[in-house]
């Protein structure tokens, strides 16, 4: 995230093979004059990363970090790292999910992810600058809480990748029968669908949850 031009915080959740556990690491800019040093540390960390998973980083975060690398005449590690943008991957399924917005907090709420942080990015910039003036530990806690829950929340959002996998054909057909008016198909997805989905349209219906997906396609007869 940034505050009036400065990258003031970065965070990453990564698997540590040595410890056999996931570790959350945060970088925080408590002195704006040390922005370059923080970026050097963050980019050094990325040098061993094979893939980035983020939420809507394609639109802002990644281009902004690339801009900062150019500004400080640093090597940009992002260009050589594979990237998965959860927002871009899930946005086509907004209507199926029945969501009015695909903001991360909206998706998390849909998935019943428990979140304490209630601040948005613009509010956090003000909190950050207040912290620089006051060094109030409570404001610092708010900043770290937001980052912490942003990263953990993506863990729950990841489960929704079952939807693009399903629509890309990652399933096996369990049964298929014709009732005379509709074609009833039962599918088993490769990834379990984490939420109950039920959608109906003029040409059929779809229900999905867990390891079961049911598809009903209405048939039409006509004379040539």
For the regions a protein language model found, what residue spans apply to each?
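Two-metal-ion RNase H-like nuclease active-site motif
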Residues: 1-2, 147
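Short, small-residue-biased leader/transition segments that mark boundaries at the very start
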Residues: 3-8
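Basic, amphipathic juxtamembrane/active-site segments
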Residues: 9-14
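DEDD superfamily 3′-5′ metal-dependent exonuclease/proofreading module
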Residues: 15-224
């Amino acid at each position: 995230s940034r505050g009036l031009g400065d990258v003031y915080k970065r965070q990453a959740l990564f698997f540590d093979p040595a410890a056999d556990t996931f570790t959350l690491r945060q970088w925080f800019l408590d002195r704006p004059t040390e922005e370059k040093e923080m970026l050097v540390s963050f980019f050094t960390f990325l040098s061993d990363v094979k893939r980035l998973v983020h939420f809507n980083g394609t639109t802002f975060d990644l281009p902004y970090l690339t801009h900062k690398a150019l500004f400080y005449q640093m090597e940009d590690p992002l260009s050589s790292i594979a990237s998965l943008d959860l927002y871009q991957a899930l946005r086509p399924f907004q209507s199926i999910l029945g969501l009015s917005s695909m903001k991360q907090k909206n998706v998390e709420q849909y998935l019943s992810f428990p979140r304490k942080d209630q601040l948005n990015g613009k509010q956090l910039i003000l909190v950050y600058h207040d912290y620089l003036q006051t060094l109030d530990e409570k404001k610092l806690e708010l900043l770290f809480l937001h980052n912490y829950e942003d990263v953990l929340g993506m863990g729950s959002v990841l489960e929704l990748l079952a939807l693009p996998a399903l629509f890309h054909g990652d399933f096996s057909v369990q049964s298929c029968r014709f009732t005379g008016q509709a074609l009833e198909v039962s599918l088993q997805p490769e990834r379990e669908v984490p939420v109950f989905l039920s959608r109906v349209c003029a040409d059929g219906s779809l229900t999905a949850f867990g390891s079961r997906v049911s598809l009903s396609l209405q048939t039409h007869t006509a004379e040539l």
